[in-house]
Structures are given as structure tokens and as C-alpha cells.
């Protein structure tokens, strides 16, 4: 008999081989892109055991990589006892099917998009988030159904990366017509959620609160910034895509001006277009903001490329022309020389540490200044019977002059742009 009770052990992580291609016009160095792919694989529960790379002008139509590299990959899979091969670029359904036959069962072949979708499936917490992930997964799977029929039963029993798509659902067991019907049904459900969100957003729009949205590369520290600023306890982890569902918190700026700040899903290079499309309702929080804080990990050597990736996604969702403020986070990890370099190169940006709180006062001051810049200077004679409007000016505006007249109050005040129209009929200038 055992002297100690047996403790259940965690399942062994899947052994993954990463495959990357160095293209002539690579925006990122291949090794850095594969580093990020390895972090994605780790987030999904895999252990990277080897890497394989090739320099190409364009992918091979049948196999994506050359035949010699396919043979090398097969040998590497055997030697490393790999469970899954992850490509850093998108594979066509026929390329994926060819490679699966080449390496042999039970090894899985997936691409970067499938890996990101898998992580989203793990991290979606709300009904809206799960609906959006299911939609993106089904859109990805639909053109791949032909090659999946022979592997479907095995995938569902093997588990692990690439097999969590639609867990608990039967959509993979039905034909294309039913898949399309499911996609249509998900779109309708998401539309209903959007309508409820629109009601909530309209309520926020009608309030005088200055609306701020956090946007940035995944793991740049957006959730930690939200927690540091508002004193909340939003989940913050050193993992890619730890936050999928938008979270809004309230904050009062110096002088009493109200503010809402919303944390949103992180961006990443090669972000699948299907995810951008599926998460449009979530990303609409960025579109509705008065100010977008672009949060950047200053300690990452690829911070400039990450900032470019964020700008591309903002452009894609129609937020490229919105008012933005760049916040370089994690400056506690920089030495004095690097900090000085950032200040010289980005004089309009805020240097900040969500971990230690350094730079918090500067950040709040910059947000307050941006909020004040959107205010409207207004003079009005408000009749005494409109006591609610007079109170509104005192509570929501900055009163510059107040004079009591025989039939009302003459005020000169700076008011939030969303409040000023309520006084328009009494305006005197």
C-alpha cells in the first residue's frame, strides 16, 4: 500500500515543431516571428521541441514548403516524437491535407490562424466572446471540411491543440449546408448581443463621461494598466490573449470629470482577418471612444513593429483617425539611457509602469488635458424653471461665470461636448 495518497499529475504538454518561412518582404525577422509563435504555442499548452525554416519567394502550391523540406520535416517529427507541427503562415486546405499525409498520423498539422483560434477558444469567458470565437472557428473550418472527414473522429478523441474548435458542439459532424446555417445563426445571435451592447453604449454616450479605450499588442500590459489606474482587479496574466472580453471601469479625473476606460482584446501581427470580422462588436468599443490609449511594451525590442501592427488593425476597423495617446508601458524594465531615448524619440508619449505606478500622475494629467480639449465653451441664460440644467452645469462643467438675473441664471462654462447640446436653446452667443 502506498504511504502517501496519489496526486493526479498534469497531462504532458504536446510536443510541437514550429515551421517558418523567410519571405523576401518579411515585415518581421523570422526568428522573432517564430519566438512569438512559440509563445502562442506555450499559451495553448504545447512545448516547442524544434524549429524548421526555409527561404522562399512564394509558397509551393501543393506542399507550401519544398519537397526536400517536407522530407526533413518528416524525419524531424520522428526523431523528436512530435505531436503537432505548427506553421507560422496560413496553409490552404489542400496544403494542410498533403502535409498531414506526408508526416503520417497521429501528428497534426495546423497553421498560425488555427493556433490563435484555439487560444481564443480557451480564453473566451462571456457568451458574446464564445459566440464570436465559434463564428471565427467555423469560418476557418468551412473550406477545410473535405479534408477533415477522414480525420474528424481521431481529432475528437486525441484532444489538444487544434481539436478544441466547437467543443461540445456537433457542427463538425454535419455537412457544409448545416455549417453555413450554423454560421448564419451565430451571426444573428451576435447581432442580438450587439443590439444590447448598443443600448449600453448609447447610455455611456449620453453621459458626460470621457470615454477612453485601451488598444495595444497582446501582453503589452493593458489589463494591468486598467487595474493600476482604477484600482480594479481585472484578470492580468503574462500570457498572450489573456483578455478577450471587453471590460469597462469608471474613474474620476482631477476636477471631478467622469471617465470610463475599456480594456479590449489585444492585437498581434498576422491577426487573422476572420477574427477581426468576428470581433467587430467587441472592437466597436474602440470606435466609440473619445481617446484611444495605444499601450506599447517599451521593454520589447520589437516595440516599433508591434506599434505598426496596432496601427494596421486600428485602420482596418476604421479607427485610424481617432484621437490617440501612445503609452509606453513597462518602463521599470528600462535603464536611464533607454528612458532618455524614448523621451527624445517620442516627446508626445507617456512613459509609464503599470507594475510600479511610475508615471501614473503624468498619464492622468494627459488624459485630463485631452478631455478638457474636447469641451465646449458656452454662454447661456437658463430660466429658473430649468433647475436640472443649472445643476447639470455645476456637476458636469467647469463654471467660469455665473450671474443671477431676474428670470434666470446667466452662465459661462466649459461643458463636455455631449452635454452642451442640452443648453443650446438657451445659448446667448
Where are these regions (language model features)?
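Flexible beta-alpha connector loops of hexameric P-loop NTPases
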Residues: 24-29, 59-63, 123-129, 171, ...
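C-terminal-of-GTPase-core extension/linker across diverse P-loop GTPases
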Residues: 1-19, 23, 38, 143-220, ...
Amino acid at each position: 500500500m502506498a504511504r502517501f495518497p496519489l496526486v493526479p499529475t498534469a497531462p504532458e504538454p504536446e510536443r510541437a515543431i514550429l515551421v517558418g518561412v523567410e519571405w523576401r518582404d518579411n515585415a518581421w525577422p523570422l526568428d522573432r516571428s517564430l519566438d512569438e509563435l512559440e509563445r502562442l504555442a506555450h499559451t495553448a499548452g504545447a512545448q516547442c521541441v524544434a524549429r524548421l525554416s526555409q527561404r522562399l519567394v512564394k509558397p509551393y502550391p501543393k506542399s507550401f514548403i519544398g519537397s526536400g523540406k517536407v522530407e526533413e520535416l518528416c524525419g524531424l517529427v520522428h526523431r523528436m516524437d512530435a505531436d503537432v507541427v505548427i506553421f507560422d503562415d496560413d496553409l490552404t486546405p489542400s496544403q494542410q491535407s498533403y502535409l498531414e499525409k506526408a508526416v503520417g498520423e497521429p501528428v497534426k498539422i495546423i497553421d498560425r490562424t488555427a493556433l490563435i483560434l484555439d487560444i481564443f477558444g480557451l480564453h473566451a469567458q462571456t457568451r458574446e466572446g464564445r459566440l464570436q470565437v465559434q463564428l471565427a472557428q467555423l469560418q476557418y473550418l468551412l473550406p477545410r471540411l473535405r479534408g477533415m472527414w477522414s480525420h474528424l473522429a481521431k481529432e475528437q478523441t486525441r484532444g489538444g491543440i487544434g481539436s478544441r474548435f466547437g467543443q461540445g458542439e456537433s457542427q463538425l459532424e454535419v455537412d457544409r449546408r448545416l455549417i453555413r446555417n450554423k454560421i448564419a445563426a451565430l451571426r444573428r445571435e451576435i447581432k442580438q448581443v450587439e443590439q444590447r451592447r448598443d443600448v449600453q453604449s448609447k447610455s455611456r454616450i449620453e453621459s458626460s463621461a470621457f470615454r477612453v479605450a485601451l488598444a495595444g499588442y497582446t501582453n503589452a500590459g493593458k489589463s494591468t494598466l486598467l487595474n493600476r489606474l482604477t484600482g480594479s482587479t481585472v484578470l492580468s496574466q503574462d500570457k498572450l490573449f489573456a483578455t478577450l472580453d471587453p471590460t469597462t471601469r469608471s474613474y474620476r479625473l482631477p476636477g471631478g470629470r467622469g471617465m470610463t476606460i475599456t480594456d479590449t482584446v489585444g492585437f498581434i501581427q498576422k491577426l487573422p482577418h476572420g477574427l477581426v470580422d468576428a470581433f467587430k462588436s467587441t472592437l466597436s468599443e474602440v470606435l466609440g471612444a473619445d481617446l484611444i490609449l495605444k499601450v506599447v511594451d517599451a521593454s520589447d525590442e520589437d516595440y516599433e513593429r508591434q506599434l505598426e501592427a496596432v496601427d494596421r488593425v486600428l485602420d482596418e476597423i476604421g479607427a485610424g483617425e481617432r484621437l490617440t495617446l501612445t503609452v509606453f508601458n513597462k518602463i521599470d524594465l528600462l535603464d536611464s539611457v533607454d528612458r532618455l531615448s524614448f523621451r527624445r524619440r517620442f516627446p508626445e508619449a507617456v512613459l509609464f509602469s503599470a507594475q510600479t505606478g511610475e508615471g501614473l500622475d503624468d498619464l492622468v494629467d494627459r488624459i485630463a488635458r485631452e478631455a478638457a480639449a474636447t469641451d465646449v465653451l458656452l454662454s447661456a441664460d437658463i430660466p429658473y424653471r430649468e433647475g436640472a440644467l443649472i445643476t447639470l452645469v455645476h456637476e458636469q462643467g467647469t463654471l467660469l461665470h455665473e450671474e443671477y438675473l431676474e428670470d434666470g441664471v446667466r452662465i459661462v462654462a466649459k461643458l463636455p461636448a455631449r452635454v452642451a447640446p442640452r443648453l443650446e436653446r438657451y445659448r446667448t452667443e
